[in-house]
Each structure stands twice: as C-alpha cells, then as structure tokens.
Amino acid sequence: QVLVKVHAASVNYIDWQVLTGESFFLRLTTGGLRKPKHKILGDDLAGRVEAIGKNVKQFQPGDSVFGLSASAGAFAEYRCVPENHLAHKPASISFEEAAAIPTAALPALLGLRDRGQIQPGQKVLINGASGGVGTFAVQIAKSFGAEVTGVCSTSKLDMVRSIGADHVIDYTQKDFTQQDERYDLILAAGGSSSIFDYKRALSPDGTYVFVGGSLASFFQGLLLGPFISMTGKKKLGSLVMTKLDRGDFVSLIKLYEAGKVVPVIDRLYPLSEVAQALRYFGKGHAQGKVVITMVPEDKA
C-alpha cells in the first residue's frame, strides 16, 4: 500500500450513482444495498506519496503520482492506495489534470484501441462526446488518425469541435442512428440508444463498443452483443475492465505530452465544497470533468 497526500480528485458518474442509490444493481454488487458501503466517495486522485509499505518497489515518499483509489475514499486529504493502481505523474501535467484522467481516459483508450481495434482513416462516432469519457475519446480517436464525429447537446457542440471532432451532431435535433451515415467504429460513452439502433448505424464490418451510459445499454452490449455478432461481420459488445495496466497510464501521459490529449476540466471545487461539486455534476451540465482540489496548485 502507498499512502498518498491527495492534492486533487475528480467526480465520476459512479460517485453520483452511489450517492443517490439510483442503481439497484450497483447497490447490490458493491455491498451497499441499504446505504453506501464507503462513506467517502471518489476513485480518481493525484497527489504526493507520503509513506510506503515495506513491499512497495515502484514509489518513494515525495513522488508525484496519480491513479485509482481502488475502493472509493479519494475525496479526502489522505488515501491508502494499492501500488499497482498508481503511476508516476510527470511535472508537465498538473495535479488537477492528472486527477481527471483515470476513470474517464482509461475506458476511452481501451474501448477504442483494444476492443474497437481503431485504425487510421476510419469513421468513428463518439456518443456522449462532451462528458468525461467522451472528451478523452474524441481526442484519442483523433490521435489514431480517425475521422471523428461527436454526439452531444446543443450547448456543448463548440467545445466538442474545439477538442478535435471533425463533425458534430446535436442529439436534440437529429438521431444519428436513423440517418444514412455509417460508421466503422462507434464508442458509446453516454446515451441510451438500443444495441439494435447502434447496429443499424455501423458499416457492414463495423464495431460498437459500450463504455458508458445507461445500465440497460451496458447489459445489452454484454449479453446480446456476442450473439448479434455471430450473425454477421458487425461486432458489438461492452467493455469490461478486469485489471489495471500501468502501461496504459503511461500511454495516456505520452499522448498528453505530445499535445494530442488534454483533460477538459469544467469546474474546480475545494474539498470543503464537495457537496456542491456533486450537485453540479448531477445536473448533467458539465463539459468534461469536475475536479475537487485539496491543495492549491501554487502550494503543491
């Protein structure tokens, strides 16, 4: 275990789900059927190593790190984290930016690169392009040389264009699954379209990957996807992250340092205003990530 003095953490959809208890499945699987199992929320964090366990090999006190807390508790001044859930934070990226990466950027990277097998020149659509996962997905897809279409609401179109989307679709005005355009790869980072709608929007040998959105869409991808995929060349499914690979954190940092991926941060809140941060996130208006700060950057 590594004791981290937390400088910044970020809010994710799972925090809102745990807080509100709106997902019975989540309550059932996390052991918090009647009340949250963990009193302190937060999975993503960035900070400095305060102390290490005797078997820790990769880090030393004073190292700047970022990663996942493993079992919530990141909205705090200190957090013990498994060694394999952390990576070194280079000086080129701020603590706030680093804290915005793990839960959002990892599924975007794995969904596009590994499950989606993205290739240069492909037509890629990101549904939910303005959220935490979506903003990373747009930029990562562009870094692979894809032609990217981002789907979001009216007020967020300009932001999605600004991070590299070649085309944008306002879902309040147009349903992309009912149009003539077909896509080689669709990454669902939001929305509630059915797996059959997504299938319709794919090219003849296209791929659909669910990484975020409604629980119904997740189970459709997980349970129906493999069977639908057996009936033709189209491949459909949900991304299930079973273990962390520190190398993926390194890949994301390299993209950042190359100027190809920049965390989109909507708002910063001090730890004392974490309730307001969660309330704002819950309204669904955030563009990119909402970040909680424990130590001001100028004092870090």
List the model feature ranges, each with a label.
Residues 1-10, 24-72, 189:
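Glycine-rich beta-strand-centered segment in the early N-terminal region that forms part
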Residues 64, 123, 206-207:
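Short glycine-centered segments of the SAM/dcSAM-binding site in methyltransferase folds
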Residues 69-83:
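A structural motif shared across PLP-dependent enzymes of the aminotransferase-like
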Residues 99-170:
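Mid-domain Rossmann-like dinucleotide-binding core that forms the NAD(H)/NADP(H) cofactor-binding site
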Residues 177-185:
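A short acidic, Gly/Pro-enriched loop at the edge of an enzyme's catalytic core
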Residues 253, 260-267, 275-300:
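C-terminal capping/lid region of NAD(P)-dependent oxidoreductase domains
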